[in-house]
């Protein structure tokens, strides 16, 4: 499972991205408001067949998957994260950003506390696509009680989780008094549950992080 339900405003007119097997694909951004009025601006990719329904400043609802791809930026390898659109729907009047995902912990989770005392755990989920041999490696972040419990998960653990795909702006220090504006894209988790072999939910190992949801939405 790898599904995102996203609705919001189209920031700009879609632009040609790539062509494969005779089919053209286009990319653009959707801005989606949280309840806190903060905005996540997410890159989306769609096939040409949807193009005539995508107009700048229109509100729209889409269903798709979170996709990732490595690319070279000079000598560095970076991760491209975007929403691959599979369905278009009429805007329902409220912005939405909800993700359901199952996958495997593929790195050692990193637990830390911010200067303001917030507990955070960063980790990466490998989600296998339905086509054989391809996976998407999705950065994820957990907060509070969820942060502590996810920090204890072992590499290879199969989990189901839900949350929001967020864009987070930050400043990276590149010199003594010099900073670079950057944007991180990550799955902000509000619930997760361990899965048994075959994808069956394990009732003994689940964490509902809804007690942290208000902080998650205002973060």
What are these regions (language model features)?
Residues 59, 63-92:
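Short, structured interface segments
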Residues 1-7, 13-24, 33-41, 49-52, ...:
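Acidic, gly/ser/pro-rich intrinsically disordered tails
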Residues 58-71, 157-170:
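Flexible glycine-rich surface loops and low-complexity tracts that mediate binding to linear polymers
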Residues 45:
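A positively charged, amphipathic N-terminal helix/segment that binds anionic biomolecules
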């Amino acid at each position: 499972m790898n599904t995102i339900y996203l609705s919001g405003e189209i920031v700009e007119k879609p632009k040609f991205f790539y062509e494969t097997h005779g089919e053209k694909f286009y990319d653009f951004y959707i801005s989606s408001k949280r309840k806190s009025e903060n905005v996540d601006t997410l890159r989306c990719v769609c096939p040409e067949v949807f193009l005539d329904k995508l107009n700048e400043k229109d509100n729209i609802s889409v269903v798709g998957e979170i996709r990732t791809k490595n690319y070279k930026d000079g000598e560095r390898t970076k991760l491209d994260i975007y929403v691959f659109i599979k369905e278009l729907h009429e805007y329902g009047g409220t912005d939405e950003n909800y993700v359901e995902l199952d996958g495997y912990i593929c790195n050692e989770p990193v637990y830390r506390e911010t200067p303001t005392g917030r507990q955070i755990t960063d980790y990466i989920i490998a989600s296998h696509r339905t086509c054989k041999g391809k996976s998407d490696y999705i950065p994820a972040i957990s907060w509070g009680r969820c942060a502590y419990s996810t920090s204890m998960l072992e590499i290879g653990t199969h989990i189901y989780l839900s949350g929001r795909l967020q864009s987070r702006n930050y400043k990276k220090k590149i010199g003594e008094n010099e900073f670079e504006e950057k944007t991180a894209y990550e799955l902000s988790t509000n619930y997760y549950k361990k899965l048994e072999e075959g994808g069956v939910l394990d009732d003994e190992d689940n964490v509902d992080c809804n007690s942290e949801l208000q902080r998650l939405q205002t973060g």
